[in-house]
Amino acid sequence: MKNPIIFIIPLLALAGCSGGDAPLYKDPAQPAEKRAEDLTSRMTLEQKVAQMCQWVGLEHMKSAEKELTEEELHNNTARGFYPGITTADVEQMTRDGKIGSFLHVLTAEEANYLQRLASQSPLQIPLLIGIDAIHGNAQVAGCTVYPTSIGQASTFDPELVERICEETAAEMRAPGS
């Protein structure tokens, strides 16, 4: 071999192209406690507070935007709307990692869209998606609505209440909650 440098330079260049090690918090092989410590050590106070902020889903906001007047959109919190904040603002806040959770996300498509937005955030923390379903998934058309918790308790039938909970859970999983 006359000039070994011809082979060494490309190898060094390829070695320099590696993306580097992923942060510890993204390594599922690591213990949860270490991952949590690593993630929180990288977070600013604003990012930590944002993880505790829960907003209503975009489709819920869009329906309010259609039905409320311009004045109502900017001056009150009717239907869980945020005065002066549009769905586009919420989308950007999600991309920026300033929202940690959504409530009233009614479809798997919406949940997936929101998770894609969160994956663009600096730390790529997945969102927590929730919905109030204390007596069935009443927010989604076609789902079963059961009596409230006190009504269920008054049956004195724990097996019935357990079946209600199982059916509610199945109906909740369908749209991605």
Task: Tell what function each PLM region has.
Residues 1-2, 47:
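Generic cytosolic/nucleocytoplasmic N-terminal low-complexity/intrinsically disordered segments
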Residues 2-10:
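Sec-dependent signal peptide recognition
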Residues 10-12, 98:
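Short, intrinsically disordered, low-complexity terminal segments
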